[in-house]
Amino acid sequence: MLQNPTFWVLVAFVLFVAAVWRIAANTIGKALDDRAERIREEIEQAQKLREDAQAALAQYQRKQRDALKEAENIIAAAREEADRIRRRAATDLEASLRRREAQAMEKIAQAEAQAVQQVRDLAVDIAVAATERILVQNMDATRDEVLVGNAIAELPAKLH
């Protein structure tokens, strides 16, 4: 058997396979270890990215809640401002209407006073004209002298 070349080929083949196996096992083991390390790093990176994404999502949700609260505050402030403007406009309108009513009442009072004055003036004019006509119709020279004499006699008493 030691003389048989097939035996030595078999021994050489087994030694070759063992050497290749040892080298290949180390290389394959190292390659598998490297690949496992890369996979572990990728998993860690994926977990880190997931945590970052969750943090970003939480931050976005906080910002969205804050934005909604701010929008609600802005809407509430706008409503308050609109109510304040509406109340001020109503107050201003009411004051304006009161002023216009007072002005109208004043104009009406002035017109009434003017009308009353015109009626009085007209009544005085009519009374003077009627008195003049009556005096012209009823006066004669003797009566005229008596009235003038009486008026002159009463004059010193009225002056003192």
Swiss-Prot record:
It is found in: Cell inner membrane. GO terms for molecular function: proton-transporting ATP synthase activity, rotational mechanism; proton-transporting ATPase activity, rotational mechanism. One of its GO terms (cellular component) is proton-transporting ATP synthase complex. Keywords: ATP synthesis, Cell inner membrane, Cell membrane, CF(0), Hydrogen ion transport, Ion transport, Membrane, Transmembrane, Transmembrane helix, Transport. It is a single-pass membrane protein. Pfam families: ATP-synt_B (PF00430). The chain crosses the membrane at residues 5-25. F(1)F(0) ATP synthase produces ATP from ADP in the presence of a proton or sodium gradient. F-type ATPases consist of two structural domains, F(1) containing the extramembraneous catalytic core and F(0) containing the membrane proton channel, linked together by a central stalk and a peripheral stalk. During catalysis, ATP synthesis in the catalytic domain of F(1) is coupled via a rotary mechanism of the central stalk subunits to proton translocation. Component of the F(0) channel, it forms part of the peripheral stalk, linking F(1) to F(0). F-type ATPases have 2 components, F(1) - the catalytic core - and F(0) - the membrane proton channel. F(1) has five subunits: alpha(3), beta(3), gamma(1), delta(1), epsilon(1). F(0) has three main subunits: a(1), b(2) and c(10-14). The alpha and beta chains form an alternating ring which encloses part of the gamma chain. F(1) is attached to F(0) by a central stalk formed by the gamma and epsilon chains, while a peripheral stalk is formed by the delta and b chains. Belongs to the ATPase B chain family. This is ATP synthase subunit b 3. It comes from Rhodospirillum centenum (strain ATCC 51521 / SW). The gene is atpF3.
